[in-house]
Amino acid sequence: GGHKPAKVEADLSTGWAVDTIKFALNDALVNWAYSLTKDVEIPASVSVAKFRSQFTDNPNARKPPFVTIGDTLSASTYWHGHHLNHWANDWVKLYSSQQGNFMTSNMEDSGTMTALHRLARINKVDANRVLILRTASNFTVPPPGKTATWSATAEYPDKGRAALEAAYRV
């Protein structure tokens, strides 16, 4: 194990790490997909807009739904709150040589990517042809005045259907 917290990606070689900690997508493929989808109109219901309006400290959270490019962090634990969000930002920065931009959390993408990269090692898939589409149905931090517990247990507006609709349209 390491003797002190890693500050830059090079520090990771002094501790325990595996090659399935981070996955980079093909930038050209990502940019191609973004160019095709960046102007897709994603509808938002009144209840979704009302929920978003609570996030007075986050201008992006209050915007209508939009297509963007960013990084996700996979974890086996469903987490929320400012402290863990800070940790997630640090983790993404560390594993991306300070280039990553943490946007969303997820649980399944690391498993999917691990499987695809293992298949790539035996020439069954081309990992350079992988794209991941994420839609957001909730936030990793609560709005001002709410707790992380509230954030983790708040009902999704319209039961998360807006995220499904966004995935279909994009």
Outline where the language-model segments fall.
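Accessory terminal and edge-of-domain segments that mediate assembly/interaction
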Residues: 1-170
